[in-house]
Amino acid sequence: MKKVTKAVIPAAGLGTRVLPATKAMPKGMLPIVDKPAIQYLVEEAVRSGITDILIILGRNQSIIEDHFDRSPELEEKLAAPGKEKMLEECLGIANMANIYFVRQKQTLGLGHAVSVAKAFTGDDPFVVIYGDDVIWGEDPVCAQLIRAYEEFGRPCAGVSAVPWADVSRYCSLKTTPIHDNYFFVDDMIEKPKKGQEFSNYSILGRVLLTPEIYDILANTKPGAGGEIQLTDAMAEYARNHGGMTAVEFTGKHYDMGNKLKVVEAQVELALQHPEIGEAFRASLKEFCKTL
């Protein structure tokens, strides 16, 4: 079994659900305290043992490339005495992994975005980190999927039980318990209508795939929303290629395409921030007295 060392981050979305913040800035660059959202995704991959990361961009998103590149002018300024920590942080961003970029010339859906990564992943298994989904926790979700892949030898999906009223916004998996937080998956459906749901287990932003997915994607027709859905390709794999493993992951999920969840991410991660956490907690307590 090949070791999982590659990750793909589709980040070409327009971010229409969080306009006007994304009118001139990619959704992935929305800040959570002092880091853009996409940096949290890259850091999760690195913490999971990933060494090579492909970020899939759309038009006018070169700012993401700039963020993960060296910045000689800034580094020169930060070389002054007393700014060593900031310099170290900036250098670390550029050096944390081998990060590559490719443009998705047409935004035809998540499945199409993943197909763009074929030359990058080759014959290797790889993790897909959805660009909308920041998941915060001590145990990175990518690492949880990699462990499941090593145990069961099948593609994996990070799942969570969502309220039944919300299943139609996500996908629904047909699951059979294996042990602990692992389930066998032999079917799934994207954005099911009422009565089509298999369960209230939905994929929330992380999957681990094998190269066989590319042939399936090449023959996947547009589905929900008129887009090529990755879920449809994974459903085909689950039904006809030996099934998948669902991992009910641990970690707090934030949808960066949801304004309320963006604010929740700001507040909850600020409370855990090593520099401002305690001061922010005190400030928040005072503010809550006014509610």
Could you say what each language-model-derived stretch is?
Residues 1-7, 279-285:
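Positively charged, low-complexity intrinsically disordered leader regions
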Residues 6, 51-53, 98, 125, ...:
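Residues at the starts of beta-strands that form the adenosine-phosphate
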Residues 38, 64, 117, 132, ...:
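Residue-level signal for inorganic ion chemistry
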